[in-house]
Amino acid sequence: MPAKQTSGKGAKKAGKAKGRPAGASKTRRRKRKESYGIYIYKVLKQVHPDTGISSKAMSIMNSFVNDVFERIAGEASRLAHYNKKSTISSREVQTAVRLLLPGELAKHAVSEGTKAVTKYTTSK
């Protein structure tokens, strides 16, 4: 019996099979968009149980929450940097809230934040 031809025109390459890998589907999965939507909806239902929210209003609220988050995080980061700290603690966040939010709103935000941190630490 003659030896198999491994090079030249008629040689077949062994190795990777063409096509999709096992378990892959035809359609690509869309990347999930993260949003505060479910949390905004939960708070809305706590405050006004009989009120709904449109998708446009939800989008505006989501943008608002992202904006406030970025402002607080940026200010807290700056405060940590000024004090030569590499970690943002609740103290930096609290100070950032006091600097960014006006008067009574800052007081309420600080008290709610303190309450949330206390609840979290006691549940651990």
UniProtKB/Swiss-Prot annotation:
Tell me where the cross-link Glycyl lysine isopeptide (Lys-Gly) (interchain with G-Cter in ubiquitin) is found: 119
Q: List the SMART domains hit by this protein, alphabetically.
A: H2B
Start-end of Basic residues biased regions: 10-19
Give the species: Psammechinus miliaris (Green sea urchin)
Protein name as annotated: Late histone H2B.2.1
Q: A cellular component term (GO) from this record? A: nucleus
**Quaternary structure and partners:** The nucleosome is a histone octamer containing two molecules each of H2A, H2B, H3 and H4 assembled in one H3-H4 heterotetramer and two H2A-H2B heterodimers. The octamer wraps approximately 147 bp of DNA.
> What domain of life does the native source organism fall in?
Eukaryota
Question: What is the recorded post-translational modification?
Answer: Monoubiquitination of Lys-119 gives a specific tag for epigenetic transcriptional activation and is also prerequisite for histone H3 'Lys-4' and 'Lys-79' methylation.
Function as written in the Swiss-Prot or TrEMBL entry: Core component of nucleosome. Nucleosomes wrap and compact DNA into chromatin, limiting DNA accessibility to the cellular machineries which require DNA as a template. Histones thereby play a central role in transcription regulation, DNA repair, DNA replication and chromosomal stability. DNA accessibility is regulated via a complex set of post-translational modifications of histones, also called histone code, and nucleosome remodeling.
Residues annotated as region Disordered? 1-32
Its primary localisation, in coarse terms, equals nucleus
Q: Gene3D superfamilies in the record, alphabetically?
A: Histone, subunit A (1.10.20.10)
- SUPFAM superfamilies in the cross-refs: Histone-fold
